[in-house]
Amino acid sequence: MRYSILLLLALILVPSQTAAASDKVVKDSITSQNKKRSFYLYAPDSVKSGTPAPLIVLLHGSGHNGLSLVDKWKDFAAKEAIIIVGPDSMDPSRWASPVDGPDFLHDLVESIKSKYTIDPRRVYLFGHSGGAIFALYMSLFESQYFAATVAHAGALRRREPAIGLAKRKTPIAIFVGTRDPLFPLEDVRGTRDDLNKQGFAVELTEVPGHDHNYYGVAPKINQSAWEFLKKHQLNEDPQYEQYNWNK
């Protein structure tokens, strides 16, 4: 692809199952772009062997790690038979392209697919804060790879040119508190409006009295997020877009 992408996101911030499901969160790593990358994986016992399961990639907030979201999703994932994975960003204070994605996220998902029976048309993104922003960008870069995205407390910059990269209008839901000091309603509504103008169907939920703290309301947010995500899947097998980040 001949796009010249000079985007550095410095943010606020298997045919049969070869690995057994477990009720333990496992910390593991892969090598991606010649770098060792850590992640936290939870494949609950409720995931039936040989039955394709959905996968949610959880992108943590700035200053945290993948475990911070996996811990909050674990019980719900067990109830709904969802495999979840929380990768660590290279720099804990931010997510950035190209070091953290899309290639790293693609490598991570494909690695999990090689060990578990994942439904390739039901691979989703969920992000909080800095991770929410990154999830929105990944939805644009890899619109034919990720089926749908939920962002909690995140927004794009106004009139973001990367919106034009999307070959598919990824279903997106955004949750934001009416008292979030980092993401004012005006900014989040602007993201919704910019995406809507380009043909995206964006669901925006403004949570009355809620601030930026996802962790205190995680069970409610997670359930609402899954209610949105599970309605969507790719209409055909995923296609991964390769970018030349050096031009």
Where are these regions (language model features)?
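Primarily recognizes the serine-hydrolase "nucleophile elbow" in alpha/beta-hydrolase
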Residues: 69, 114-115, 121-168
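Serine-hydrolase catalytic machinery in alpha/beta-hydrolase-like enzymes
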Residues: 25-46, 50-121
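Conserved alpha/beta-hydrolase "acid-adjacent" motif
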Residues: 181-187
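Histidine-bearing beta->alpha loop at or near hydrolase active sites
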Residues: 92, 207-214
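A domain-start/cap signature at the N-terminus of enzymes
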Residues: 17-55, 100, 107, 126-138, ...
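Short beta-strand/loop motif that positions the catalytic acidic residue
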Residues: 174-176, 180
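Bacterial N-terminal signal peptides
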Residues: 6-14
